[in-house]
């Protein structure tokens, strides 16, 4: 996170010519990044993903023990004993983080978490179940029967390949290019060991770096 914060804080001269461009640039190829890439693609965007690690299987999602907390999924709604809502879910997350979280991204996640889990189910997610989990006032932990986070990555990798979305591994972000006139980040430089790519992001950048 520190190198990325440094990259974002230093004014960078925008390249006169880009090496490549996409509508949406996703940084990070774990569960959040690959899901974002699929969703942007399905809404008509050209997407490219840059990942610091060597594989999507070298990410936090793969190491999560097959756990996905979600509110409003089909599985949760099917249990009549569970009465849950996105605001209660958000309150649990914010309390667990000692009220230091920004509410907007937490609300965005909790409102759409059930929909996201249903999407994984619809695209072939392996067997799973519901269970209680520490810090949550309701039963919303969806756990893979395998206890392996790679079940999620398996689904997402399959869908990324089906959509022919470019994923560049071992390509950490080292610069962000900010256009003062447009008042937004318009591109990134990714790479290492003297080999770098300047990629324009015509619509935006998704930060999913953990």
Regions found by a protein language model. Give the residues of each.
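Generic hydrophobic/aromatic pocket-lining and core-packing "Φ" positions
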Residues: 34-37, 117
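Short beta-strand "acidic-cap" motif of Rossmann-like dinucleotide-binding folds
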Residues: 46-51, 207
């Amino acid at each position: 996170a520190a190198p990325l914060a440094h990259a974002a804080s230093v004014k960078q001269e925008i390249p006169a010519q880009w090496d490549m461009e996409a509508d949406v640039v996703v940084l990070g190829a774990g569960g959040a990044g690959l899901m974002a890439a699929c969703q942007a693609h399905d809404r008509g965007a050209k997407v490219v993903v840059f990942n610091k690690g060597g594989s999507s299987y070298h990410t936090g999602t793969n190491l999560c023990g097959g756990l996905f907390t979600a509110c409003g999924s089909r599985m949760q709604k099917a249990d009549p004993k569970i009465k849950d809502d996105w605001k209660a879910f958000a309150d649990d997350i914010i309390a667990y983080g000692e009220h230091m979280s920004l509410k907007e991204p937490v609300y965005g996640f909790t409102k759409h978490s059930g929909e996201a889990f249903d999407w994984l189910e619809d695209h072939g997610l392996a067997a799973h179940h519901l269970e209680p989990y520490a810090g949550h006032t309701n039963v919303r932990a969806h756990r893979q029967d395998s206890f392996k986070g790679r079940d999620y990555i398996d689904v997402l990798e399959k869908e990324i390949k089906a959509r022919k979305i470019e994923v560049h591994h071992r390509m950490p972000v080292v610069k962000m290019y900010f256009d003062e006139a447009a008042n937004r980040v318009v591109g990134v430089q990714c790479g290492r060991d003297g080999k770098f790519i300047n990629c324009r992001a015509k619509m935006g950048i998704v930060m999913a770096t953990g």
